Amino acid sequence: MSIKILSFIFGTLMPISAFAALPYVGLYQTIDDETNTPKSIVQLYEYQDGDNTELAGRIVALYDANGVISETLENPTRVAEKVKNTPKMVGLDIIWDMAWDADDKEFSKGKIMDPKSGKIYSSVIWQDATDSLNVRGKIGPFGRTQKWNVMQATDLPDILQNIDTGDWAPTVRK
């Protein structure tokens, strides 16, 4: 009888913990370092890599020079010219292999790609404030940190409100 009870408990609790959302999953607005204007919207999403649940990030929208969303997953046009196979910018995975470090409350050991240059860097992601996320790309001790703004889906066009990331896995273009 006790084996049946334990089986029931583990059988019902395991799926809940297995599908618990990783921190920071959601939509973020990136800001151009030089012009301080909105550049893109990135969807951070979780995916399975073997037995590990990891974090990745995909560009889901781009802004024009006036700060208006000009491209989404429905209408990508601009290409990442310096990225292998010149993919569209919208739909491009720019973050992958990010592993959660519960002690440091950050994601690390992953990669981030600059879609303009095609260069890939080590990355760390953490949060100091609830309205933004720190995203750092680095080579050794040298790097740059950007603040990404938390976006509410309801403030965005319909196409960005209910993105289904369930079958997403990063496509890495080295």
Language model segments and positions:
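Short hydrophobic/aromatic-rich beta-strand segments that constitute the beta-sheet cores
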Residues: 30, 57-59, 108-110, 133-136, ...
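N-terminal signal peptide c-region/cleavage motif recognized by signal peptidases
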Residues: 15-18
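Amphipathic/hydrophobic helical signal segments and adjacent flexible N-terminal regions
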Residues: 2-7, 20-23, 27, 33-36, ...
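Surface-exposed interaction patches
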Residues: 105-139, 143-147
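Central antiparallel beta-sheet cores of small beta-barrel/beta-sandwich binding domains
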Residues: 30-32, 37-123
